């Protein structure tokens, strides 16, 4: 990406990285630094956008579906705080590296805490948001750009 000399770099990842459990947290943080530091050296404005939550229950996936074991695993990781740990780590790295944060994950968490069935907002019942929720990411990114 840096070879294209962008004015702005938007980074968003962590959903799949959390599959490495807590043992992968340091690797995840290092991967973030390996993106942020070269961008900073090139004076490229960088925004880290936290991703959406994973599913919190497996009921949206039909029993016997090939995705059922994943749905159960992801729900466990989400509810037990594993993904929260990854997002907390990302926020800390952003602060350390002075990278602007667009915290969409915090919005998803707040919706969940207010009683929204966030699993219903995932198109595959696992980890990919429905089209309408992509709009949330877009608007939050615009808000972040205009206010930083």
Regions found by a protein language model. Give the residues of each.
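Alpha-helical cap/lid subdomain in secreted, periplasmic
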Residues: 1-148
């Amino acid at each position: 990406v840096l070879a294209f000399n962008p004015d702005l770099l938007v980074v968003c990842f962590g959903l799949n990285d959390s599959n490495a459990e807590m043992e992968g947290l340091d690797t995840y943080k290092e991967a973030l630094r390996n993106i942020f530091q070269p961008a900073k050296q090139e004076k490229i404005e960088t925004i880290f956008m936290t991703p959406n939550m994973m599913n919190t229950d497996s009921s949206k996936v039909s029993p016997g579906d090939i995705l059922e074991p994943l749905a159960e695993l992801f729900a466990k990781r989400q509810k037990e705080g594993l993904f929260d740990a990854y997002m907390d780590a990302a926020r800390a790295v952003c602060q350390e590296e002075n990278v602007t944060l667009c915290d969409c994950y915090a919005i998803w968490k707040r919706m969940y805490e207010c009683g929204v069935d966030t699993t219903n907002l995932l198109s595959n019942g696992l980890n990919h948001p429905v089209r309408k929720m992509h709009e949330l990411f877009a608007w939050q990114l615009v808000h972040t750009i205009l206010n930083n």
